[in-house]
Amino acid sequence: ISITGSNGKTTTKDMIYAVLSSKYKVLKTQGNFNNDIGMPLTIFNLDNSYQMAVLEMGMSGFGEIDRLARIARPKVGVITNIGLSHIEKLGSQENILKAKMEILNYFEDDCIAILNGDDRLLLSIKKEKLPFRLEYVGTTPNADIVAENIVIKGEEGIAYDMHMGDTSYNISL
């Protein structure tokens, strides 16, 4: 699982790790070592004892996430949001979107992209044009997976209702 976005990468990585490591042996990127040195160092620690890896991918320009994705070959890609970080180098949020979308460059038909359904630029990605599965997650009806009734419990975690089509779950993390 690889994660990128303008904000929230490390928190998202740590939350995914917390959930998965309750059942699986999972390797994760330490801290925010998410560049072309730090992420490959994490992968060097990946051996057969691990069932999964959760990798953070950062960038400041075009081609950087592509290099990381070529190394990691994720089966699941998460994009948290498209903000203004690195706009001075990339020129526009649309270009930031293009750079972040590089995380999906090596996806095959068995891969899943999970995008923030509350982000207008990410919502511009059309599902029917992709050779892999795309799911939007958010708090609005635009999302495929919707979180409602969110309660932040401080150090105790977070609770919310999750809706996927006609199915609902009470989630507590």
Name each model feature, range by range.
Residues 1-117, 121-130, 164:
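Phosphate-binding loop of NTP-binding sites
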Residues 93-94, 127, 131-173:
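Adenine nucleotide phosphate-binding catalytic loops in nucleotide-utilizing enzymes
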